[in-house]
Design a protein with these regions (language model features):
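Glycine-rich beta-strand-centered segment in the early N-terminal region that forms part
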Residues: 1-30
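Glycine-rich phosphate-binding loop and adjacent beta-alpha segment
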Residues: 31, 149-212, 221, 243-249
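Glycine-rich helix-loop-beta junction characteristic of Rossmann-like nucleotide cofactor-binding loops
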Residues: 74-78, 139, 160
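A short acidic, Gly/Pro-enriched loop at the edge of an enzyme's catalytic core
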Residues: 137-145
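Mid-domain Rossmann-like dinucleotide-binding core that forms the NAD(H)/NADP(H) cofactor-binding site
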Residues: 19, 59-130
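Hydrophobic beta-strand signal
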Residues: 24-25, 40, 85, 169
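N-terminal Rossmann-like NAD(P) cofactor-binding module of classical short-chain dehydrogenase/reductase
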Residues: 24, 129, 144-147, 169
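A structural motif shared across PLP-dependent enzymes of the aminotransferase-like
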Residues: 30-43
Length: 249
């Protein structure tokens, strides 16, 4: 939940940005500071804001889009023609993961509740699974990659649908090495890292209309607690952001 208005002051060694530039950033986990009107970001954490979207929309991109990118592209090495199963496809990470996978030329199977089946299809999902009515393992078989943002029983059942030599990435739990060995697959637990070049690539896809940003609600900074409570429900559609200032004119 970060709203980046732009560069207010640049450090002496800063070469990429100058005061007045518009950028977005994923702050290092050791610094954070996004719940504020002003924050400090290094050049390796920031990239120019996509021109085709608002600042509110831009705030909903860095953390979740980088997570999806680093899970699918950097970690699982997803390539054209492969099949990926994305759990929680209507959420922040999931909605970006679907579109990144499609831009990569992959076939996408995604899970979501009944209310979000329409969104899965709008985002380009090839096979949409309603987890309230269907077991994903009855539909998704021998997939190349699984992206898990749910954990628990969903993760435990996901090992069974990955083909030999495939990859499973979880964002919320530890990978079970015994299960990886049993199914002869690879796996990893992911922690997202700041990456300005990947943010720039994501921004390019957004401006090319290959990625659509979904922001379900923008809370004022004074209602940060309400925003956190909404996130904690685990049923957020797209991204929730904090608005810390009016859009620049």
């Amino acid at each position: 939940m970060r709203h980046r208005r732009g560069c207010r002051k640049a450090g002496a060694k800063t070469t990429k940005f100058k005061p007045g530039d518009s950028f977005y950033a994923h702050l290092n986990v050791h610094n954070l500071g996004g719940y504020a009107q002003y924050a400090v970001a290094s050049e390796v954490e920031a990239a120019s804001k996509p021109k085709s979207i608002s600042f509110i929309e831009a705030a909903g991109v860095p953390a979740v889009a980088l997570t999806a990118w680093q899970a699918l592209i950097d970690t699982a090495k997803l390539s054209a023609g492969q099949t990926v199963l994305i759990h929680g496809g209507s959420g922040g990470v999931g909605s970006f993961a679907i579109q990144i996978a499609k831009a990569r030329g992959a076939k996408v199977i995604a899970t979501a509740s009944t209310a979000n089946q329409d969104l899965l299809k709008q985002l380009g999902t090839d096979v949409a699974i309603d987890y309230t009515k269907q077991k994903f393992e009855d539909i998704a078989k021998d997939v190349d990659v699984v992206l898990d943002s749910v954990g628990k029983d969903t993760l435990a059942r996901s090992y069974n649908v990955v083909k030999k030599g495939g990859f499973i990435v979880t964002l919320v739990a530890r990978i079970d090495q015994a299960e990886l060995d049993k199914h002869d697959i690879q796996g990893a637990s992911l922690r997202t890292e700041p990456n300005s070049s990947e943010l720039a690539e994501i921004g390019k896809l957004i401006d090319e209309k290959k990625i659509r940003v979904i922001v379900s609600h923008a809370f004022p900074l004074s209602e940060a607690i309400k925003a956190q409570e909404q996130v904690a429900t685990g049923h957020t559609r797209g991204k929730i952001v904090l608005k810390v200032a009016d859009e620049p004119k």
